[in-house]
Amino acid sequence: RREARLAAIAEAKAKIEARAEERDATEQAAYQEKVARREAQRKAGKKPRGRDPEPPTGGPRDKDQINFTDPQSRIMPVTGKGFDQCYNAQAAVDTESLLVTHVHVTQATNDKQQVMPLLTAWQGYPETLGKPDHLLGDTGYFSASNIQACHDHGIEPLLAMKRDVHHLPVFERFAADPPAPESEDPVEQMAHRLKTQAGRALYALRKHTVEPVFGIIKHVMGFRQFSLRGLDKVSGEWRLATMAWNIKRMHRLTAG
């Protein structure tokens, strides 16, 4: 029994180190992106806002853990509940039909790495399904690389650059559009777009689209948590849940 426990501990340690390497690579890429963006702003004669980013610290951390019940799950923040063992379920929803157009499940604790899988999936869809022209996402999806990736795929991104303000002051709500930036930087162009009347109206569709779908799946259809273990099985559960929503929604659409 002692040998088995030591072997399990050694295996857990190896997994923690492997996860730390993946996290280090992601954090280093994000750091380099921020540094490059600030340097580009300086070269353009603009002063970057805030302090320069601190380089990430590599290696395993004191709070890194392995779950022996479901090793593929990850500790993630849960709204109003602190932290729990979770998977990150993603879904893209069409703003007109409210049909789910793409789903996947990831072990990543944030959403910044989830834009490219979506764009890649959309690119492989049959032409008869049409092509999205905008991608609306909250601040969790914002990064300069995601904005550029959307443009590379012929899609205009509207990704919140800070937490949503639910009730804008009346003056801001009806203010004239600000002048367009002289810079062709995609991030600055998108920031301007989000400040225009048309851009705000378009982005506002997000809270009437994906949030109700998640809410109905949870509170009406009763799918509040995964019952199986492992990424593949959990992914299958999520596909079934969203498929059930699509069938429910298509029945509603065809019934008039």
Over which residues does each language-model region extend?
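Anion-binding and metal-coordination hotspots
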Residues: 1-256
